[in-house]
């Protein structure tokens, strides 16, 4: 029997497609995950930057806040970044501050004047109180971007264009520790010493056909974290470098010093990612901790 819609028009052909719910759910989830991971959560291998960090660096470039210029208020830069990104100002400022924190990045991409936080767990000053510009390494990440070496796409409201990736003259993929947690996917690439990476790259370029991971590890001994610390499972490094997956176990360099009835634990550095907040200090209240 024919069916009629609200306009009393006869509908004679109803095309109903039967689909498998499991297959459709899987496909839709994968499409969603890929969109979130690429657009927000996971750094690109080309420059090892998340989209928000790339937008921040590009904003410094187009506003001429390079390393040789005087820094300007972070709040002003955040406002310019929002033209490229629909993020909130607080989230954008947090991402900007991270690019300047020397205990989180082995080679900071932003130079900041004012309080940008510290290892004690203290947060940064408000954006209206700090000034920022690109660091010299930040300059290198954007060098030659005006020479048609990367693709550009419209921003979210198509009012201007932004780069898909940065030229990345500095090997940020290996030297800049960055991580991301997306949908069913996470990434964490640790930092390495620039001189060691440079030497390894030079060796690889002249020994492409025969170069092995073991050869490269003659130059790159292991990760180089900004806060120091020592790797206690160094024997696993070769497997981690070959597979791209693994766990690094770290501990600080420390001395135990006895003075009469008292004992001091003197820490000389910290494992990467550990801050001296209350959670770290609480178990150590009976000791005198010094020399950080």
Can you annotate each of these PLM segments?
Residues 1-244:
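Catalytic phosphate-handling regions of large nucleic-acid enzymes and associated NTPases
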